[in-house]
Amino acid sequence: MIRRNGMTVPLPGHLHAQRDKLAQLADWGYSDIWSAETDGADAFTPLALAAAWEPRLRLGTAIVPAYTRTAPVIAQSVAALADAAPGRFAIGIGSSSNVIVEKWNGVPFVDPYKKVRDVVRFMHDAFSGEKITKDYDTFSVNGFRLSIKPEQKPTILVAALREGMLKLGAREADGVIINWLSAQDVSKVAAVVNGAANGVEKEITARIFVCPSENTETVMAGAKFAIAAYMNVPVYADFHRWMGRAPLLQGMWDAWAAGDRKAALAAIPNQAVDELVVHGSPAHCRDVINEYFKNGVTTSSLAILPLDPDLDYWKAVESLSPSAS
């Protein structure tokens, strides 16, 4: 599988003003853009704009939560984008987290494995063109038929942390989307995916958090805030226990559980930042990103973290691009 170099969107600034920036990404050798959906733009709108504006870019969602839209609504959005960008759209589906699903959207965060599996299975059923009347474990559909039939079926990827979801993405989808892991962690994750794939080549897309700055003290401080925000979410805490990172993070977890946020930040060792956030000179960052690929990643989605106030975002993007290698 060829190496694909991607960037996370939406980019900084207003969406209506990003056409030239998307063209610049392609000029610098980026092949993909992958949308992130949290509390800003939805996963699909930035990609719809890019579908019309920049035909050189492949488009992907990383990710669409399985809970916050019904399965037919997800299928309609997927079909529309796949029809707008034939052969260059990938849908990444995942459980998201209890914070986004339950606390923000008021949807019970129950049976995440089954929910994601059922939505993936529904996607396959919907793109068959047949009318669907079926009881899945976590929802039922009665009489739905997807009326848009794209020229090419979209790639379907599963956002995965631990073994269950990784194997699901290998067995029932076209691959997985991973994030918040080190280049060394990829070897363990890729082994699970490839072991469950029955010899079929699978895509492994990684969101890689990067800050190409040598202002180490400032980067460390900002990165620890990001690590605390994510690694205390149960799904990420469980993932890093599985990865063997409990000795590094247990102090933070204990302080956070006790309600002492200041102590939790102080308990995060610099080693955790070095492992989970790529930082340093642009050349060093490119070398570390290459390690992700060597260990099994096939597609990157770089996420530039503005941890250094002196960092110029677009210079950072250019410095990490294939054209800079």
What are these regions (language model features)?
Residues 1-325:
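Active-site-adjacent structural elements that line small-molecule/cofactor binding pockets in enzymes
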